[in-house]
């Protein structure tokens, strides 16, 4: 008699050419990920070869009950680390039956901006540092924290090791390897300043693929925490008080910034961001005012500043970038719950397309 684990790990490649495709989309809150699976007659390597699909948008807060059908357009394919073999994860965006993007489809406008010829020729690179917090399932309290109590003050936890400093490493390492298997351009992980909080980095990725890959990496993380019986939150300030919040620092460069003379291009871009500070803050994640206080390695939400090697600034330029006269900058304002489609396209629009 086969056990449940045997069936979960069943290798289908020897018995059928069919594959399983897990279609992923963003739900009505703008942060909730949804997915469902279907089989296909054989391996698929490009999203244009995949069929569109549909779902009940009235059950995700994205359509009324009397006209509930929302259409999924496949946009990116990655390997499925849970089913393995030729099975795939499919990142989709969402449209009405008439082919119009629904309001929560932020990818559509992002793709328009990032495919603009003036943007495309600059080949924008993004490196996104996604922070998150692991919570004990039934009490919504950080992993490793005593129930109803607090751990010792911050200090020993950042990149810390040991059972009294590092909580959830099995989840984090599983996520790292699953992303690598799937084809996410994940570039690293580390424990964060607050215990129970972690970070993974995606990038450098070019253009719209940055958003696709961050969303799929989030999906993989939520699936792994589901298996582990742990909750992941992207709340930018999950614990009030003298504890670090959670951000999604976004590193960015263009071809002009990476070439000789690029430092001036960086300074000009950062000055543009200062002029659009309020608009960017409004789009950089909900609850960010609880995080951007001017404390805990953040700038105050009401001010816009930049500096070399300054982690208390809105935008940080690396010391190496200054020395080389070219490179990239880091926008430290985005919250952990930001939409990477919105943030990446908005930075490109402000720094490349906008003429003040």
Curated annotation (Swiss-Prot):
The keyword Ligase applies. Its EC number is 6.3.1.2. Its main location: cytoplasm. It is found in: Cytoplasm. It is an enzyme of class 6 (ligase). GO terms for biological process: glutamine biosynthetic process. GO terms for cellular component: cytoplasm. Keywords: ATP-binding, Cytoplasm, Ligase, Nucleotide-binding. It comes from the Eukaryota. One of its GO terms (molecular function) is glutamine synthetase activity. PROSITE patterns: GLNA_1, GLNA_ATP, GS_BETA_GRASP, GS_CATALYTIC. Pfam families: Gln-synt_C, Gln-synt_N. Residues 106-356 form the GS catalytic domain. It catalyses: L-glutamate + NH4(+) + ATP = L-glutamine + ADP + phosphate + H(+). Belongs to the glutamine synthetase family. Homooctamer. This is Glutamine synthetase. It comes from Hordeum vulgare (Barley).
């Amino acid at each position: 008699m086969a056990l449940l684990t045997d069936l979960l790990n069943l290798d289908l490649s020897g018995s059928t050419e069919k594959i399983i495709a897990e279609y992923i989309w963003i739900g009505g809150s703008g942060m909730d990920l949804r997915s469902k699976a279907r089989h296909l007659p054989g391996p698929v390597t490009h999203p244009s070869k995949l069929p569109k699909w549909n779902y009940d948008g009235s059950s995700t807060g994205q359509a009324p009950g009397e006209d509930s059908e929302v259409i999924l357009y496949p946009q990116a394919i990655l390997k499925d680390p849970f089913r393995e073999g030729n099975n795939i994860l499919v990142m989709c965006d969402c449209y009405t039956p008439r082919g119009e993007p629904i309001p929560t489809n932020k990818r559509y406008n992002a793709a328009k901006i990032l495919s603009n010829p003036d943007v495309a020729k600059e080949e924008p690179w993004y490196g996104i540092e996604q922070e998150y917090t692991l919570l004990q399932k039934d009490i919504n309290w950080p992993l490793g924290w005593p129930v109803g109590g607090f751990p010792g003050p911050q200090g020993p936890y950042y990149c810390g090791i040991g059972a009294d400093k590092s909580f959830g490493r099995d989840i984090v390492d599983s996520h790292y390897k699953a992303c690598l298997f799937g084809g996410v351009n994940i570039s690293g992980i580390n424990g964060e300043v607050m215990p129970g909080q972690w970070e993974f980095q995606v990038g450098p990725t070019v253009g719209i693929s940055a958003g696709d890959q961050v969303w799929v990496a989030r999906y993989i993380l939520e699936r792994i925490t589901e298996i582990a019986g742990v909750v992941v939150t992207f709340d930018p300030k999950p614990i009030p008080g003298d504890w670090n919040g959670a951000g999604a620092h976004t590193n960015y460069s263009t071809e002009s910034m990476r070439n000789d003379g690029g430092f001036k291009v960086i300074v000009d871009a950062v000055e543009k961001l200062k002029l659009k500070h309020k608009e960017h803050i409004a789009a950089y994640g909900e609850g960010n005012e609880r995080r951007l206080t001017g404390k805990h390695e953040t700038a105050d939400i009401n001010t816009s500043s930049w500096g070399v090697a300054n982690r208390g600034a809105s935008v940080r330029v690396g010391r190496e970038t200054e020395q080389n006269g070219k490179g990239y900058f880091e926008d430290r304002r985005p919250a952990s719950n930001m939409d990477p489609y919105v943030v990446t396209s908005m930075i490109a629009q402000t720094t490349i397309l906008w003429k003040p």
